[in-house]
């Protein structure tokens, strides 16, 4: 079976948008999130309205693109007249309400961040937001809808940049590379140093390391204290 040309693939990615246009919805926002699984950092969502007639041939599911490709696509999205909103929920709120509810909060904030209220939402996943806006949940929507794919790229680029900034503040965890996910280096740093202020304390990987990290810190202080004492005599 031959591969579809780029034009055909682009048309496929506009199926849900065109369906919404036929129903009378002019402003269709794609919504996606990133950062549900990491042990550290916020969950970030983006809402993107791609103007009718705009083509973004390089845009695809953010997970299938390299970091450089995502950055390039993000610049294209931001420079082609797309309306973009970003929502962010911090680790303390994730711990308070759970990651699913925090994801919904981030999505709602992203919609609120759009310059013009959308008429219809296309949401990645089988979700429905508590908003009085027509909406459709699309499982694996970032591979099926141009608007959702654009949102996935914007959210991913925004969060990756945030985690690189956090790396400058908390370098021992390697956030510039792992972006908060539970890599071997990250878990080792958690065991050695315990969690930092942007860790999600309700997540199992962080909870499991808390005692070890605190014990290591206490042991280090005890050892340093002994070294600093003067012998009696």
From Swiss-Prot:
One BP annotation, GO: mismatch repair
Pfam families linked: RNase_HII (PF01351)
Entry note: cofactor: Manganese or magnesium. Binds 1 divalent metal ion per monomer in the absence of substrate. May bind a second metal ion after substrate binding.
Known EC number: 3.1.26.4
PROSITE patterns xref list: RNASE_H_2
Subcellular location: Cytoplasm
Broad class of the protein's primary localization: cytoplasm
Catalysed reactions, semicolon-separated: Endonucleolytic cleavage to 5'-phosphomonoester
Molecular function GO labels: manganese ion binding; RNA binding; RNA-DNA hybrid ribonuclease activity
Entry's family note: Belongs to the RNase HII family.
Stated name of the protein: Ribonuclease HII
Source organism: Syntrophobacter fumaroxidans (strain DSM 10017 / MPOB)
């Amino acid at each position: 079976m031959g591969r579809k040309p780029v034009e055909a693939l682009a048309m496929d990615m506009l199926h849900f948008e065109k369906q919404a246009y036929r129903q009378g919805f002019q402003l269709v926002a794609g919504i996606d999130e990133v950062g549900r699984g990491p042990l550290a950092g916020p969950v970030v969502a983006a809402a993107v309205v791609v103007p009718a007639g705009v083509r973004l041939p390089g845009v695809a599911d953010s997970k299938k693109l390299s970091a450089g490709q995502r950055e390039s696509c993000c610049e294209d999205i931001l420079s082609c007249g797309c309306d973009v909103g970003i929502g962010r929920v911090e680790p303390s709120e994730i711990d308070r309400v759970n990651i699913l509810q925090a994801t919904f909060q981030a999505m709602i904030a992203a919609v609120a961040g759009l310059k013009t209220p959308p008429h219809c939402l296309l949401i990645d996943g089988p979700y429905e937001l508590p908003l009085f806006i027509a909406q459709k949940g699309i499982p694996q929507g970032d591979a099926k809808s141009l608007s959702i794919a654009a949102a996935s790229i914007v959210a991913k680029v925004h969060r990756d940049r945030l985690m690189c900034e956090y790396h400058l503040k908390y370098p021992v965890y390697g956030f510039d590379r792992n972006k908060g996910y539970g890599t071997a280096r990250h878990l080792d740093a958690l065991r050695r140093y315990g969690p930092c202020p942007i860790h999600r304390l309700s997540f199992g990987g962080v909870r499991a390391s808390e005692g070890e990290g605190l014990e290591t810190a206490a042991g280090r202080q005890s050892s340093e204290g002994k070294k600093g004492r003067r012998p009696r005599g």
